[in-house]
Amino acid sequence: MKQLSILGSTGSIGVSTLEIVAAHPDRFRVSALTAGKNLELLARQIRQFSPRIAAVAAKEDVPRLAQLCDGLEVKIVGGVEGLIEAATADETDMVVAAIVGAAGLVPTAAAIRAGKDIALANKETLVTAGHLFMEMVSSHGVKLYPVDSEHSAIFQSLEGHRSDDISKIILTASGGPFLNTSLEQLAGVTVGDALNHPNWSMGRKITIDSATMMNKGLEVIEARWLFDAPMEKIHINIHPQSIIHSMVEYIDGCVIAQLGMPDMKAPIAYALSYPERVATGIKPLDLTTLTGLTFFKPDLEKFRCLGLAYRAMADGESMPAVMNAANEIAVDAFLEGRIAFLQIARVIEETMDSHIPHDLKSIAEVLQADQWGRDTARDICRRLSN
């Protein structure tokens, strides 16, 4: 029986994780749940899964959650300290790190220091502090399993092979809702347009990141750290059908890929159950019904955020953390109707142009760089919205 702490249980990944837990009560048990603002859903999850600890991001929400959970045997905590307590619960074997954005850094780091294995859905952890987190994973002897569909595909395609034999890591991308939209048309797209992803059901922030292709840029940086691969070996192919989730090409010319229907339950289940597999209820892939699989290079002129992510990784040091922070602020501003879709890239670029990269030696320094990026991006958003 594997005990799980699920950080971000009310988000898309958290909800899917709990569906897998519910389908396999003989294999998984929930020891802790955490959430941001969706207290009603968190309370329903607590009633169903009976965790010992439940944490909310804001301490002021603790009384409200306690009221919603009246009569239940659960310890309710709040704030960063509460998230850390949930992430480091003694009985927990694995932490599902699914808090969106840089807010997941501190509890994920605490879980690693406490010796917990990690199912990593929070890509910002490695984007902003990849060198620090991979050092912690190594020094504390924990296992890190990717939950992103692309990185799970690479992880599976690498099994049993030597890293020296890798020629290329090929991340696939659907191209998002604007794959066939012209640059001129992008100037007028709405929030509703951007949230209408053709293949995947995801949270709002990651869906916008998919529309700008920043999501793929973050995944390139994440892959660099997860698989200890130089950037020049990591490539992106647009694959609109989202059937091949990623590939690895080896020096002998062979390519190994992972295929499946686009459903996040598959990579989540593999991370939870590795090295075994469990049933997910996903519709099986019927290759005979596929009319074709297509691949082509991304348009960096149209999807400028992708190029900015490559630039951030090339600059290194604090720049990826600043880039990620600026993206979070810009996406929020777009979702709130304060800036236009194409201005997301502008906010990120202007923030990066204002930053001089410097070495980051601790999580505290990463958070300082993150805050600088947020403050700078907010100022730019205010200027653009006036």
From Swiss-Prot:
The species is Pelobacter propionicus (strain DSM 2379 / NBRC 103807 / OttBd1)
Per its record, how is this protein called by name?
A: 1-deoxy-D-xylulose 5-phosphate reductoisomerase
Query: Which residues are noted in the entry as NADPH-binding?
Result: T10, G11, S12, I13, G36, K37, N38, N122, E124, G203
Q: Which reaction does it catalyse?
A: 2-C-methyl-D-erythritol 4-phosphate + NADP(+) = 1-deoxy-D-xylulose 5-phosphate + NADPH + H(+)
Q: What is its EC number?
A: 1.1.1.267
Residues annotated as binding 1-deoxy-D-xylulose 5-phosphate are K123, S149, E150, S174, H197, S210, N215, K216, E219
User: What does this gene product do?
Assistant: Catalyzes the NADPH-dependent rearrangement and reduction of 1-deoxy-D-xylulose-5-phosphate (DXP) to 2-C-methyl-D-erythritol 4-phosphate (MEP).
Upper classification of the organism: Bacteria, Pseudomonadati, Thermodesulfobacteriota, Desulfuromonadia, Desulfuromonadales
Pathway terms, separated by semicolons? Isoprenoid biosynthesis; isopentenyl diphosphate biosynthesis via DXP pathway; isopentenyl diphosphate from 1-deoxy-D-xylulose 5-phosphate: step 1/6
Molecular function per GO:
1-deoxy-D-xylulose-5-phosphate reductoisomerase activity; manganese ion binding; NADPH binding
The record's listing under InterPro entries reads: DXP_reductoisomerase, DXP_reductoisomerase_C, DXP_reductoisomerase_N, DXPR_C, DXPR_C_sf, NAD(P)-bd_dom_sf
The alphabetized UniProt keywords are: Isoprene biosynthesis, Manganese, Metal-binding, NADP, Oxidoreductase
Family label: Belongs to the DXR family.
Cofactors, names only: Mg(2+); Mn(2+)
